[in-house]
From Swiss-Prot:
Species whose genome carries this gene: Roseiflexus sp. (strain RS-1)
PANTHER family (alphabetical): CHLOROPLAST 50S RIBOSOMAL PROTEIN L22-RELATED, LARGE RIBOSOMAL SUBUNIT PROTEIN UL22M
Encoding gene, per UniProt annotation: rplV
KW RNA-binding (keyword) present: yes
Keywords, alphabetical: Ribonucleoprotein, Ribosomal protein, RNA-binding, rRNA-binding
Name by which UniProt lists this protein: Large ribosomal subunit protein uL22
Length: 113
């Protein structure tokens, strides 16, 4: 059975989040959280929060054992971008896109329904 957690509108670019996700994909939840705890990335904190939420959803909503959970699917989708203006020389302006990310984690205990 699977349980899912989504964190939306995280103010970090998806391209910065995806390499951190690759480190924990397919690993047991406890091991994934241990890996993320010692990474110096902002993305690691946000991913850890989402994994903990998925684990809580699995144990509270679906009565799954928290020790048996693995990170089956984890991916980052692009959210809306905040558009800002940066003044440039000669009266011009450049657009700055502050990107956001939607983080999705699906944990599985390996049992079929």
């Amino acid at each position: 059975m699977q349980a899912k957690a989504v964190t939306k509108y995280v103010r970090i670019s998806p391209t910065k989040v995806r390499p951190v996700m690759d480190l924990v994909r397919g690993k047991p939840v406890d091991r994934a959280l241990a890996i993320l705890r010692y990474l110096p990335h902002k993305a690691a904190r946000e991913i850890a929060r989402t994994i903990e939420s998925a684990r809580a959803n699995a144990t509270n909503n679906y009565d799954m054992a928290p020790d048996a959970l693995i990170v089956k699917y984890i991916f980052a989708d692009e959210g809306p971008a905040f558009k800002r203006i940066m003044p440039r020389a000669r009266g011009r302006a450049d657009r700055i896109r502050k990107r956001t990310t939607h983080i999705t984690v699906i944990v599985d205990d390996g049992e079929e329904m």
